[in-house]
Amino acid sequence: MAIPVVRLVKSLRYALKDMQGIKFSDYELIESINQAASLLYGRLSERYVYAAQKKTILTVPSVGYTVLPSDFVRIHQLVGDDGEAIPTTRLPVVDGTYRIINDTIYAKPDVYNLEYYYVPTRVKGMGDNLDVPVSMEAYIQQISLALFGNNPTLAEQIVQQCSQTLAVREVSHFTDVGPTQVLGGKI
């Protein structure tokens, strides 16, 4: 599920014609990888693309709040014993609701299934792994190169292409939508 940073750096060095590491430091290349992953996953979460989702068990203790995961960007769904909780703007929260303030979620004490959109944790060195599926590797490389070349417009175009590709991929998994129904009149 994760991509070794060393592999990404080697690919970037090849594309930049710097296999000996004379022009660019590992740090510069790793930073472009981090920026690419952050940009891509931030945009995927804005567009509600499933590929940027994670699931975890979240326990809200008796105090009524807990800290969200460190890679949390946006909530998709929070389901407890009583069913799905809905967002509220009020504190204190009531049964069946939750409120997020900064990195803290307020909810009725319970054990919840949390589905959320995330941004991969920053990588620091060549021995790390970037927490993204291998299918995203080419996009991360292309976005990194665009950012490294100081071309944010191209980076955004690649992100858009990736978002559209992944969104279509998700829809293509629907098996049978059932018979077509016409509502409100005759054909």
Which role fits each region the language model picked out?
Residues 1-187:
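Glycine-enriched, solvent-exposed interface loops adjoining structured elements
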